[in-house]
C-alpha cells in the first residue's frame, strides 16, 4: 500500500492492542516507525524503533503523529491528555474496510477496526475503540 506524505507515526504502548492499531494504520497508508513504552520490547514484530518512555521523549515525539495503543480506557485517556498538551491531538486509526456515514461525528485518537459500521448521526468521542465488525446504529 502507498504511504502518504504525512508525518510518520509513533505508537504509545506496544503489545496486542497495538498490533491491531499498527495493521489498521498500515492498511490506511500510514508509516509506523517507532514506539514508546515502559521498556524496550523483546518481541518487536514490526521492527519499530524504541524511543523510550513517552514522558521522557516529548522532544523526539514532535516529529511524529502519535496514537495511544493502550486498551485500558483510563490509561489511554491519561496518555491523550498528557501528550496532547505538547504534541497536539492523537491521530485516528480507521481501517479502510470500515463503513462510516458522512454524518458521523468523531473525536480524536479513535480506533475503528476492519468491517466496522457507523450509521447516520453516530457520535464517537475521544479515544473510543470500535473493534472488528462493530455496528453502531443511527443516532447513538
Locations of the language-model features?
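Hydrophobic, well-ordered beta-alpha structural blocks that scaffold small-molecule cofactor pockets
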Residues: 1-45, 51-59
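Left-handed beta-helix
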Residues: 96, 101-102, 107-108, 112-114, ...
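Generic structural signal for conserved hydrophobic packing positions in ordered secondary structure
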Residues: 13, 66, 90, 137-138
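Short alpha-helical
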Residues: 16-17, 74-75, 105, 136
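Phosphate-bearing ligand-interacting subdomains
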Residues: 40-100
